[in-house]
């Protein structure tokens, strides 16, 4: 089976779809470009399907390199047969390749190797091949200076047999089947650690056991974290060790023969000392990998929802980074997000300069014609919100904005480059203000892991996490589109086909030559060639440019089709964009070619319906319950407004405007069964919740979204 056939089977796609998608990827096309502008080639595959093909292609490519290494290593040992090469070449299962390689894999000096050095290999083979012979008698002929008793000879033979059993593919497969069906994951507190403060959060796992196949990703990752911190000891074993040993031994032990006891001892040793630890390690790795995949999926879903949160748009904004002792950092931004003014006010304890702070805020709101105020939701956030609302300034909207990652940004090289003359507090306030105006444009400057929507993000595979999050950011940026004349280099970096180097070149060119008047002007940017232009042009927008199509997602390679449509309708392109009736009268089949079919033509008309539209909607004003300031103010049964901050497999965390986030367990999300919480809620969604339980000692709040109307 070829890699293309294998991917097609795994993803339930046609081979032609996979073949053409891989060809496009190998030519340097990006996932957003392929899914948006090459629908005819892929058979209409969406971004998720294209990404899945790309990931499978990457994994199989890695396996191909591994297979080449295995063949080379075995060949160097002079042990490569035609049959062995054929098996490796035809295998697309990494576990099978590992099993084939195992007997040839260089290893530390083992008990079996030491026994072979003593000349005991023939004895081991006699026990296996002539089990009717007397083992004691056979062992007599192998005594020498290093082997002084028959039992020593038999022990060495058993060591050789044990290693042979542990490296036998069939033995390993037998135990794998047992693990797959009935493996149990067990967690115990490490002796002397249970009463330590750091162990408290793992209390649920001090004496925990469940079938591995039922262990959810968050439980498994919690146990593994406890293990890495030295609090828990985690094992994965068959439900019945004796039965597993018997099944492994069955292939080798011939009941009733004289050698049966020796072979059984060797098989038991193989199972306990070599085989079970090896398969346990394998299942620990695969179960962790599966848990990682699920945690990364949850993280990527949350990140996507956060990045695609509705923007307020180009408005004059006041950003406030609240604080008590250090004061509140206040900045005023123009409609493009440029910093106009900054100062610090001290309305809260210990200074309590409330009147002076109110006067300063009124002055700034007026002087800079502020249209909206963005207040960080961290320390002193609620108190600052109440202060600003009490001013009752007409025409000014007030928003609490997530501070997650703002401090990371403010101390970053990007922030220093943007604001070299300001300290971290001013940069943080600017980030909060800009985050309200355009969450996507601001959040791309921050490492996604610092945004606070991950589930065990520090415990999962770092490489897989980075690939997924980078792909998520790229997907969001290209789904929205980017204003070529206002976008930062950071935002442009994620545009299809660009990257950091070309993004910087675009900004440098824009600074030197002024705004771009046309997408075609991109070709004047140094080192931006035809391929990069093909990949990026459709995702870049020029507002009020020379060609109205430059403010749409219509790709420049298809402008001629729109021009033909306009000519056939007896008008120019701007008139066609403004005339929905004329567009409805068009017969799309007239414009079909070998390269361009109805999917692309339908997309073109959809773009002409709403040129330059932002798919994210618009930010809505939200207020927390004014009487709630801490967990002490909560009462069971209260119905409160909240904002979803994180969605996990087991439910959703909700911000109630206090330090402690509440949890709506998956069973409390709706009056029906919910398999995936993302079916019901999303990050940044405004919800109403009912307080079910309050555990002040552990800082936990249980909430429900049932019966809250």
Task: Indicate residue ranges for each PLM-predicted region.
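Generic start-of-chain signal for non-secretory N-termini
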Residues: 1-19, 26
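Long, highly charged, low-complexity intrinsically disordered interaction regions
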Residues: 3, 61-79, 89, 408, ...
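Duplex nucleic acid-engaging cores and interfaces of nucleic-acid transaction enzymes
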Residues: 33, 49-52, 59, 63-319, ...
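Short, ordered loop/turn segments at secondary-structure junctions
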Residues: 37-39, 128, 239, 322, ...
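Structured, non-catalytic alpha/beta "coupling" segments that mediate domain-domain communication
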Residues: 73, 87, 98-101, 226-240, ...
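A glycine-rich phosphate-binding loop feature that marks nucleotide/adenosyl-phosphate handling sites
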Residues: 177-184, 320-324, 378-383, 401-408, ...
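Single-stranded RNA-binding regions, centering on S1/OB-family and related RNA-binding modules
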Residues: 542-546, 550-709
């Amino acid at each position: 089976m070829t890699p293309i056939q294998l991917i097609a089977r795994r993803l339930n796609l046609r081979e032609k779809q996979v073949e053409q998608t891989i060809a496009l990827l190998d030519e340097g096309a990006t996932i957003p470009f392929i899914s948006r502008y090459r629908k005819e080639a892929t058979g209409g595959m969406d971004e998720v399907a294209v990404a899945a093909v790309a990931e499978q292609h990457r994994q199989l490519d890695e396996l191909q390199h591994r297979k080449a290494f295995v063949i080379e290593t075995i060949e160097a040992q002079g042990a490569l047969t035609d049959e062995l090469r054929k098996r490796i070449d035809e295998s697309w299962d990494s576990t099978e390749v590992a099993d084939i390689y195992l007997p040839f894999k260089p290893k530390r000096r083992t008990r079996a190797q030491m026994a072979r050095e003593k000349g005991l290999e023939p004895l081991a083979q006699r026990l296996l091949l002539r089990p009717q012979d007397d083992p004691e008698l056979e062992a007599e002929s192998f005594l020498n200076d290093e082997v002084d008793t028959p039992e020593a000879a038999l022990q060495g033979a058993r060591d050789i047999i044990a290693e042979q059993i542990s490296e036998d593919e069939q033995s390993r497969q037998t135990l794998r089947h047992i693990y797959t069906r009935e493996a149990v994951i067990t967690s115990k507190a490490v002796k002397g650690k249970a009463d330590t403060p750091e162990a408290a959060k793992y209390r649920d796992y001090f004496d925990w056991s469940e079938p591995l196949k039922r262990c959810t990703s968050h439980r498994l990752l919690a146990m593994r974290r406890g293990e890495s911190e030295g609090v828990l000891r985690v094992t994965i074993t068959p439900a019945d060790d004796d039965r597993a040993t018997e099944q492994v031994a069955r292939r080798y032990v011939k009941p009733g023969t004289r050698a049966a006891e020796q072979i059984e001892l060797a098989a038991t040793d193989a199972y306990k000392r070599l085989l079970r630890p090896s398969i346990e390690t394998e299942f620990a790795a695969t179960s962790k990998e599966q848990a990682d995949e699920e945690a990364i999926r949850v993280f990527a879903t949350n990140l996507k929802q956060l990045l695609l949160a509705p923007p307020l748009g180009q408005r004059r904004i006041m950003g406030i980074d609240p604080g008590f002792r250090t004061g509140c950092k206040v900045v005023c931004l123009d409609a493009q997000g440029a910093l106009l003014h900054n100062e610090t006010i001290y309305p809260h304890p210990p200074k309590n300069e409330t009147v002076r702070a109110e006067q300063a805020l009124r002055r700034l709101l007026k002087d800079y014609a502020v249209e909206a105020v963005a207040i960080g939701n961290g320390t002193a956030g609620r108190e600052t919100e109440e202060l600003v609302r009490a001013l009752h300034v007409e025409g000014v909207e007030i928003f609490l904005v997530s501070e997650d990652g703002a401090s990371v940004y403010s101390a970053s090289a990007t922030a220093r480059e943007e604001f070299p003359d300001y300290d971290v507090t001013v940069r943080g306030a600017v980030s909060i203000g800009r985050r309200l105006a355009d969450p996507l444009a601001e959040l791309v400057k921050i490492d996604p892991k610092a945004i606070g929507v991950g589930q065990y993000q520090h415990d999962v595979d770092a490489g897989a996490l980075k690939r997924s999050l980078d792909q998520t950011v790229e997907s969001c940026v290209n789904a929205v589109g980017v204003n070529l004349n206002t976008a930062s280099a950071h935002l442009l970096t994620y545009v299809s086909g660009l990257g950091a180097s070309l993004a910087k070149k675009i900004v440098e060119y824009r600074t030197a030559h002024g705004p771009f008047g046309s997408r075609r002007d991109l070709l004047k940017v140094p080192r931006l060639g035809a391929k990069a232009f093909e990949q990026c042009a459709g995702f870049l927008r020029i507002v009020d440019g020379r060609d109205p199509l430059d403010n749409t997602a219509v790709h420049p390679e298809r402008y001629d089709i729109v021009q033909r449509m306009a000519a056939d309708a007896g008008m120019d392109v701007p008139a066609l964009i403004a005339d929905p009736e004329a567009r409805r009268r068009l017969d799309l089949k007239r414009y079909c070619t070998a390269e361009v079919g109805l999917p692309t033509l339908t997309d073109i008309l959809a773009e002409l319906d709403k040129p330059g539209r932002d798919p994210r909607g618009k930010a809505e004003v939200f207020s927390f319950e004014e009487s709630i300031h801490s967990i002490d103010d909560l009462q069971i049964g209260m119905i409160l407004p909240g904002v979803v901050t994180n969605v996990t497999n087991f439910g959703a965390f909700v911000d109630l405007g206090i330090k402690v986030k509440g949890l709506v367990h998956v069973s409390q999300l709706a009056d029906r069964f919910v398999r995936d919480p993302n079916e019901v809620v999303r990050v940044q969604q405004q919800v109403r919740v009912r307080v079910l339980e309050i555990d002040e000692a552990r800082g936990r709040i249980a909430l429900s979204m049932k019966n809250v109307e």
